[in-house]
Amino acid sequence: NTIFISAQQHTEHTLEFLWMDSFRSDLVNQTELWQKTICEKTGLAFNEFHMRDLLNIDHPCTFDTVEEYDLLIFRKLISPDDQIHENESSPESHDTLFGLATTPMSFILTPNVLVSVREQGNKPIENYIQRLDTIMGRQIEEQNKPRKLPNTPVDLCLRLLNSMIDGYLDLRTPLTRRVEYWQQQLLQGNRRFKQWHQLFHENMAFQQIENLCEEQIETLEKEIK
C-alpha cells in the first residue's frame, strides 16, 4: 500500500487517519464552533471536564483516557525561537517558572484521529508542518521514500512531542554551568561563603525544574503504556 498525506480527502484511497491541528485562540474565542467543527470532521464529542482542561492555559501535564478517546496535555517550554505572544487584552498568561515560561499543547487521540491544540507560533510544530507541506508537493508515489511518514495517530503524536522535548534537553548546559559555579563558590577556601540566600533561591529553581520534568516523564509514560 502507498502511504501519503493530503490536505484533501481522496475517495479513491482509504483514509488511514485524520489529523486536525487547532490554535488555542480558536478554541478560546469560538468554543462552540470549534467543538461543532471537530464533531463534524471526526465524530468526536469531548466531555465538559476535558473541555475545561483544554481551555485552561495553566493546566499541568496530564494523561486521561475515556472510552471514546485519550487526552494528553504536554507543557512545552517557550523558547526564543517561538513566536508565542500573549494578548494584552486577555487575562490569560503562560505559566512562568523562575524565568522559564511554558505553554500547554493538547492531543486528543483515537485509533484513526489526532486532534492537536496549540498556541500559534509554536516553532517546532510549525517546522514539522512545513516539512509535511514540502512532502505534499511531491507525487503520491514519492512521498514516503524513505519511509518517514507517520502511519498512526500515536506515531504522529510521538513525533510532535519529540520535536518539543528538545527544549528540555537544551536546559542541561546552562543548568550544568550554574551547578559548577556554585560548587566553585562553596569550595573556595580563601574566603567565607556568604551567598546562602542566592544559593537557596537557585536550589528552589532546580527543584521546580526537576519536578516539571518528572511530571512530563510520568505523563508520557502513561501515554506510551
Give, region by region, the residue ranges found by the protein language model:
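Residue-level preference for nonpolar/small residues embedded in alpha-helices
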Residues: 30-31, 46, 167, 191, ...
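Helix-boundary and N-terminal cytosolic regulatory elements
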Residues: 1-147, 219-225
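Short amphipathic alpha-helical segments with heptad-repeat character
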Residues: 158-176, 200-203, 207-210, 214
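Residue-level recognition of alpha-helical structural elements
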Residues: 153, 157, 168-171, 188-198
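Long, non-coiled-coil amphipathic alpha-helical linker/lever segments
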Residues: 139-164
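Membrane-associated alpha-helical segments
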Residues: 112, 181-225
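Generic hydrophobic/packing signal
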Residues: 24, 170, 176-177, 183
